[in-house]
Amino acid sequence: MNEKLQSYEKQLTSDIVNNCDLIIEVNASSKTCQETLSSLLRELQLSHFSTAVRPGSDTSIFVFVKVQNDYLIELAHNDRTSSFLCGALDDLNHVNVNSVTDIDSSERIRLVYDKITGSKTEDSLGICPGENPYADIISIFPLHQPKFDIKWSKYWYQLLLGNKKQLDSINAEYGSQVALYFAFADFFKTGVFVLSFWGILGYYFLRPYSYIFAIGVALWGAFFIQFWRVQEHKLTNHWSTVNCQSLAKSMTEFKPQSYRVDSLLGTARPYYPQWEIIVRSTIANVPLFLISGCILLFLIAIAFIVDVTLSEVYSGPLKSIVSLLPAVVFQVLTLPFTFIYSIVAERLTKLENRRTKTDFQASLSGKMFLQNFMLSYTALFLISYIYGPFAEYFVPHYIQNRMSQSFFSVGYIAKSTFKLNPLRLRNQYIYFLTNAQVINYITILAVPQLISYVKKHYMSKPTRELHIQDIPSETVTLKRARSEAEKIEYDCYNDYKDFVLMFGFLVMFSPIYPLAPIFSLVNCVLYIRSSVYRFTKMVKKPVPCRVDSIAPWDQRLSLLSWLGCITMPSICYFYSSTTKPSDKSMVIAAVIGLLSEHLWFLLRMFISSVFPVDKTFFAPAKERQHLLAERSFSIPPVADVPTSTTTAFEEADETLSIYRTAENKKTK
């Protein structure tokens, strides 16, 4: 009888491993690992989660978590009820959950993850990686579904054809955040495709630095933003995520000032005054922006001056090689700066005390975008507004004269009259559209794999001789789990950043080279393909997240479009004329930019009124509550977890003994 019971329990735990919802990775090297495992298993099993413990990597243990079906139905019903009351879900029939088959993969994982990691004040377990009392937890992640990933990788090109079913399947598997990103990528690709025709017309039929071409690009940018907002609203309404941010769970790191009762849901919600968050953000961000901005501007300016000197003034040996030094040195100097900046930015964002993970990521991405903005556009601004108009003045007087008096006076400084390089701005712009994008593309794909390879083969040599014998029925799943645990976590910032920066290159500098949209179109296709590859092969499966927009990236699109209405006409003014700029040129360019900027606001108002975003009708809260009260839903009672409560603890002890045995052998 005992043998049959043990066999049945092993079968149940194998089912948990092979059909788990989440994997919790625990640091096996920690002295408090056993206490963490015991507390974790006890908390999970008391909350209707089935668990199984298995050896992970050389230094970590896996806790496989699967939610009980009856409890999942209850979680889904409660979540959909809240969504209906807040307006995110508009169909009352969808509130009812008859079986687990009514719950797609992304909703299932999101509900389980929110229940486990959410704050205890919001009726969750408060199990957060790296936070006490679960500091030994390394990460919590779901497993990829190989069948879906293989199919997605095979038919990725359907995203380029605007296939809505493909987006719906992505939403069902990865959640609305990922689906909305690919929807935006596809929409941007379509927009750039349209702009490419205007670029061809401008290149072959309009004169260089044409005002007409600049006006066309400005119109395209404004229409693109509004059309995307319309499309975005349609998708979020279709996926029932409108106004879903009001339901977002608080992070465990959030420190509320008080608690307030939610009038709709009737639950206590943690509260922290928005004005205090703004004050904290201002105090933290202003010094960061000023100091980092000055340092970065100084580095870019020095690299720019040295580049002009070596490429256009220096006439010594190995000029073709020496002229490449500024770019190499600049990259070397900015790498540590970027690393330090990202660490400081993340710590300052934590001090802002953001309530939700979405708010935290939005604030952090704002800090990072400032740095990417300067790295991407400052060189073009310097060439457009400093080198082009004034190089014939400051290069002979400040570079040639002073350098000729230094150790370069042996004849390496050209003494002939300096001539402005008319192709410098165009060449720099084409570099950012081609070489820089190729480097970025290779970096996105190659660097993570290189890091994983180095860690696996050189940096993480086994320090223990682990003797692990996996159960045959679990071998495939455990192999996948160990492989995916080594992957990096998905960061949506870099995905949006590439497209938004590309948008900026188009709407701010297109008159420099009208064929730029064609290069951007090729980059779009490559980025979409690389995104699919990274999702399926290179990163951990992201925990599904509900979002109702791509904010704050839509605001950055508007910012770049507004700046473009200043830069494009002023660049056309400086470079369309063959006469040299006069003393009043900068003033005239500023006036042109100011007038264009005012026209941009009028244009945005006009487009918004002609192509408005359809407002979703929300029934009053009391009416929604009344509708729910009239409707009766049959929810099955939550039964006990069908596994022995001692099985997981026994597995934890057995797994820990494997690591302890290996540790003892190593010390002998």
Swiss-Prot record:
- List GO terms (cellular component aspect): cortical endoplasmic reticulum; endoplasmic reticulum; endoplasmic reticulum-plasma membrane contact site; membrane
Q: Where in the cell is it found?
A: Membrane
Q: What GO biological process, any one, is recorded here?
A: endoplasmic reticulum-plasma membrane tethering
Membrane topology type, per the record? Multi-pass membrane protein
**What single Pfam family name could you report for this chain, choosing any that match?**
Anoctamin
Record field: transmembrane: 182-202, 208-228, 286-306, 321-341, 379-399, 430-450, 499-519, 557-577, 587-607
Q: Which UniProt keywords apply?
A: Membrane, Transmembrane, Transmembrane helix
User: GO molecular function, one example?
Assistant: chloride channel activity
The keyword Lipid biosynthesis appears for this protein = no
InterPro entries xref list:
Anoctamin, Anoctamin_N_fung, Anoctamin_TM
- The reply on keyword Nucleotide-binding is no
Q: Which PANTHER family match?
A: ANOCTAMIN
Q: What is this protein called?
A: Uncharacterized protein C691.05c
